[in-house]
Design a protein with these regions (language model features):
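Gly/Ser/Thr-enriched, mixed-charge loops and adjacent short helices
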Residues: 105-233
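Gly/Ser/Thr-rich active-site loops/lids in small-molecule metabolic enzymes
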Residues: 196, 201-203, 256-275, 308, ...
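Phosphate-binding and adjacent anionic-ligand microenvironments
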Residues: 237, 275-452
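Short glycine-rich phosphate-binding loop at a beta-alpha junction
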Residues: 40-47, 71, 174-176, 278-284, ...
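An N-terminal, well-structured beta->alpha segment
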Residues: 1-61, 65-67, 91, 147-173
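Active-site nucleophile and cofactor-binding loops and adjacent substrate-binding regions
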Residues: 70-79, 257-260, 282-283, 304-305
């Protein structure tokens, strides 16, 4: 019996090629995706990894063999695939392993309108079909093979984004962009073309071997080059995209990282100016500043668990205009509730270019507290350590506990959250406080229990 448990994750397919999966499995995934969605046609895109064209082509053959029409959009970012799914009204599949090393590849799937496909929304059924067909053989082809066509949507994607954020009137800005040899090198030149931006392009050559650094800007070592270039050139800001360019990380004119919570608050304020009284989603480890800014701007903040499936589900349910996560994923109602780091970056450029001050001053109003960042601890007994933390705090005066996602403990001047990793023996700690000394004290107290 084929076992796909190592590569079928909560939200996508991801594993080492060809050790864990290959084109023969990709073809079965294409057939299963066509079967489960029941679509007449689908759209497929891929990133710059060496294995991506072959895997995406095999997926297309599998879907076409079931009688499903296929539109191939070729090289694209993940949010460009979401644009294609939304604008064409088709289910989609994106071949990428995002920020993972070169030997990995994966599939992010969505239904028409960029609606997510995860374990509870079709991925479990797709896995079951692939496992069955891997053992019994693929089903016989449909009477009529689906037509495979090619389409370039990059220009339409760029035009759609530029229609959502007007950058034409901003003051000229010098911006350094580190694409990490990922798909930002493909999308940024077209999106930024003709705008009042002096673009300093770093690592725009598409190269799935990632010769300069991993395409994961949340790891501080991967933005060192960007920070240095911003400081050396006197740029107004720096932007770093991950491998599939759906996440964007920002550094200010001093080369200092801007927290994704501050970006979430800034974008929320701008979206609320367009959609007064709207709802904004934030996960439970974003800063206190996010719900504060949302309320100050007349909006309604809604707190969710960590993870894009929870954000997108809540956005669809509440009609939210925007959602943000600590991981630099940003979701927009105007983009089919899907995440697009490019659109968030354009909001930052518009906000910065619409006034005269530097970015560090602009974001200071949204960055109000001291935070630990995420601290991971290897723990054999995750449940036991969480229980010990709960026992240590449940009778303390002036604190509240909730277990929406892991354990969150909140006091007047600090809070912390501890969550177990779904895939590794780790506990993840995030602390925030009104001052750095308090944040350090709470961090050390909690780690003492976690690592006891």
């Amino acid at each position: 019996m084929a076992d796909l448990s190592q590569i079928v994750k909560a939200y996508d397919v991801r594993g080492v090629v060809p050790d864990q999966w290959d084109e023969s499995l990709a073809e079965l995934f294409g057939a299963a995706f066509a079967e489960i969605t029941g679509a007449d046609a689908i759209v497929i895109g891929h990133d710059m990894r060496p294995s991506s064209p072959g895997l995406s082509g095999a997926f297309a053959r599998g879907a076409a063999a079931r009688g499903t029409g296929v539109t191939l959009i070729g090289l694209c970012s993940t949010d460009e695939l979401y644009f294609a799914s939304g604008s064409l009204g088709l289910p989609g599949a994106m071949f990428t392993a995002s920020h993972n090393p070169a030997q990995y590849n994966g599939i992010k799937m969505c239904r028409a309108g960029a609606a997510p496909v995860g374990q509870d929304t079709g991925l479990a059924e797709i896995r079951a079909l692939v496992e069955r067909w891997a053992d019994e053989g693929a089903p016989p082809p449909a009477a009529t093979t689906g037509t495979v066509t090619r389409r370039d949507v990059l220009g339409d994607y760029a035009a759609h984004l530029r229609g959502l954020v007007d950058l034409s009137g901003i003051r000229p800005l010098k911006v350094v962009v580190d694409a990490g040899n990922g798909m930002g090198g493909h999308t940024v030149p077209t999106v930024f073309e003709g705008l009042p931006l002096e673009l300093d392009a770093m690592y725009f050559e598409l190269d799935g071997s990632f010769p300069h650094h991993e395409a994961n800007p949340l790891d501080p070592k991967n933005i060192v080059d960007l920070q240095a270039r911003v400081r050396e050139t006197g740029a107004d800001l720096g932007l770093a995209f991950d491998g599939d360019a759906d996440r964007c990380f920002v550094v200010d004119e001093n080369g200092d990282p801007v927290s994704p919570s501050a970006i979430t608050a800034l974008v929320a304020a701008r979206e609320l100016a367009k959609h007064p009284g709207g709802t904004v989603i934030h996960n439970l480890i974003t800063s206190w500043s996010v719900p504060e800014v949302v309320r100050e701007n007349g909006g309604e903040p809604v707190r969710t668990r960590v993870g894009h499936s929870f954000i997108k589900e809540e956005m669809a349910k509440s009609g939210a205009i925007f959602g943000g996560e600590h991981s630099a994923h940003y979701y927009f109602r105007d983009f089919w509730n899907a995440d697009t780091g490019m659109l968030a970056a354009m909001h930052v450029l518009a906000a910065l270019g619409g006034q005269q001050g530097p970015l560090s001053e602009l974001v200071a109003q949204y960055d109000r507290y001291a935070a630990s960042g995420e601290i991971n601890s290897t723990v054999d007994d995750q449940a036991g350590r969480l229980a010990a933390l709960k026992a240590a705090h449940q009778d303390r005066a002036g604190v509240t506990l909730d277990e929406l996602d892991g354990l969150t403990v909140t006091a007047d001047d600090w809070w912390f959250n501890v969550r177990a990793s779904n895939t590794e023996p780790l506990l993840r700690l995030n602390v925030e406080a009104r001052d750095a000394a308090t944040a350090d004290r709470v961090r050390d107290e909690v780690l003492a229990v976690i690592r006891a």
